[in-house]
Amino acid sequence: MKVSAARLAVILVATALCAPASASPHASDTTPCCFAYIARPLPRAHIKEYFYTSGKCSNPAVVFVTRKNRQVCANPEKKWVREYINSLEMS
């Protein structure tokens, strides 16, 4: 019985020590990162909104959200991406 109580105490202490790490500001960032970009433009009519990926991501990207809630990564340096962003800002 003492062995079980000791193990339980170790588990509880370990859990308590690890809990603050999950509350760090980095853990709350749920913005996805993109590792590849779409090759061709999407139809503009299919896009309802966009957002930029976090600065913590290795590749900068614009994420377009389609009317069906699909997220598509695009290269922010491409002309069509900038034009779509401008169009979305105007509407």
Curated annotation (Swiss-Prot):
- Gene3D superfamilies of this UniProt entry? 2.40.50.40
Q: Does the keyword rRNA-binding apply?
A: no
Q: Which Pfam families match?
A: IL8
Record's signal peptide: 1-23
SUPFAM superfamilies the UniProt entry points to: Interleukin 8-like chemokines
Instruction: Write down the SMART domains for this protein, in alphabetical order.
Output: SCY (SM00199)
Its primary localisation, in coarse terms, equals secreted
Q: Can you list the disulfide-bonded cysteine pairs?
A: 33-57, 34-73
Per UniProt, subcellular location reads as: Secreted
- GO biological process annotation, one example: positive regulation of cell migration
Which InterPro entries does the entry link to?
Chemokine_b/g/d (IPR039809), Chemokine_CC_CS (IPR000827), Chemokine_IL8-like_dom (IPR001811), Interleukin_8-like_sf (IPR036048)
GO cellular component terms, alphabetically, are: extracellular space
> Per UniProt, which keywords does this protein have?
Chemotaxis, Cytokine, Disulfide bond, Inflammatory response, Secreted, Signal
- This protein's superkingdom? Eukaryota
Single GO molecular function: chemokine activity
Q: Which family does it belong to?
A: Belongs to the intercrine beta (chemokine CC) family.
Q: What does this protein do?
A: Chemoattractant for blood monocytes, memory T-helper cells and eosinophils. Causes the release of histamine from basophils and activates eosinophils. May activate several chemokine receptors including CCR1, CCR3, CCR4 and CCR5. May also be an agonist of the G protein-coupled receptor GPR75. Together with GPR75, may play a role in neuron survival through activation of a downstream signaling pathway involving the PI3, Akt and MAP kinases. By activating GPR75 may also play a role in insulin secretion by islet cells.
- Report the protein name in the record: C-C motif chemokine 5
